[in-house]
């Protein structure tokens, strides 16, 4: 267990994804180019991204005692993600039905969230206490105290702040990563660069905003404001790209890249993941990432 570098805590799902040219209208039938079942969930996808990039990762969350739960475990085993911190709950494994539109380069999601997260088990607590980083999503952030972790006590904390963080105190975490839309809700009418600086200086941490295909921007006390453009790839689906970015960013930080370089590399990983229908299948390895960056200097 001590070998685990990053523990990801949060939502684990099995997704059914339909790739269509354009979204159906009400009462309309469209023919999908492809329909697949794949693993999903912000924390889960980040854990897979970390593993693909050579970081020893573990996932902590709740699944059901059902066929979907068994499929979750199979996927993580294949991806070499430690699952000893997963708990088996009383309810069905969380899942989503997702329609990904090629024309719109977007996706629409209907999700069945886990009804109740099981308490963090002892294996999970041991994994977390000995890790270098703890990465949490909108569900995992609510379980930090349960794991006995606060900022400065235990691993560094990264937060995938994709939902409802208008009033979140960023000083609770070391790496605060909302979307640009969430930052606009936190700071209405304020330029993104100013908003990032405000949160970073207030919390004395690193704050990064994802900006979709435009890339990402960040601010830390050490670097000041940095920005990194996105990459153009042949997009099949953007599903999970943000979750991939979060895992990739932590991987680059662990591997010693300074913030501006880490953002550029994480942008590239997220872009390359968009070649797949689902959020996981086309996440690159570090070798593939380096080759892509070499070709796109």
Where are the language model's segments positioned?
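Hydrophobic anchor at the start of a short beta-strand
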Residues: 6, 56-57, 83-84, 157, ...
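Alpha-helical segments flanking ligand/cofactor-binding loops in enzyme cores
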Residues: 48, 73-74, 197, 260
